[in-house]
Amino acid sequence: MSETQNTQTKRQRTLVGKVVSNKMDKTVVVLVERRVKHPIYGKIVMRSAKYKAHDESNQYNEGDTVEIAEGRPISRSKSWNVVRLVEAVRII
């Protein structure tokens, strides 16, 4: 039984969201929106949450769509890491 537990790895939580702030050093704030059905009225409503994610090279800008993954706590409010850039913001 212990062999099967060792071979199975825990899946890492990943989310996709939009960078809303990159003013902190090595940190971006990512807004993640999800659609939920209202429990009483049945209407689909948008729920959102902001996550602080670690950006080691300060390469992501406001408006970029990024994928973040949960990791070990880096600070009091930061326990997510930016994995990859999904879509860059278009500057006109």
From Swiss-Prot:
UniProt record, GO biological process: translation
Task: Please tell me whether the keyword Metal-binding is annotated for this protein.
Answer: no
Give the Gene3D superfamilies listed for this entry.
Answer: Nucleic acid-binding proteins (2.40.50.140)
Organism domain of life: Bacteria
Q: Under the cellular component aspect of Gene Ontology, which terms does the record hold?
A: cytosolic small ribosomal subunit
Single Gene Ontology MF annotation: structural constituent of ribosome
Q: Which SUPFAM superfamilies match?
A: Nucleic acid-binding proteins
Keyword annotations for this protein?
Ribonucleoprotein, Ribosomal protein, RNA-binding, rRNA-binding
Q: Which Pfam families match?
A: Ribosomal_S17
Classification via PROSITE patterns: RIBOSOMAL_S17
Q: Is Ribosomal protein a UniProt keyword of this protein?
A: yes
Q: Which InterPro entries match?
A: NA-bd_OB-fold (IPR012340), Ribosomal_uS17 (IPR000266), Ribosomal_uS17_bact/chlr (IPR019984), Ribosomal_uS17_CS (IPR019979)
Q: Which HAMAP family match?
A: Ribosomal_uS17_B
Sequence similarity: Belongs to the universal ribosomal protein uS17 family.
What is the purpose of this protein?
Answer: One of the primary rRNA binding proteins, it binds specifically to the 5'-end of 16S ribosomal RNA.
Q: How does it assemble?
A: Part of the 30S ribosomal subunit.
Among PANTHER family, the record links this protein to: 40S RIBOSOMAL PROTEIN S11 FAMILY MEMBER, SMALL RIBOSOMAL SUBUNIT PROTEIN US17M
What protein name does the entry list? Answer: Small ribosomal subunit protein uS17
At the highest ranks, the source species' classification is: Bacteria, Pseudomonadati, Pseudomonadota, Betaproteobacteria, Burkholderiales
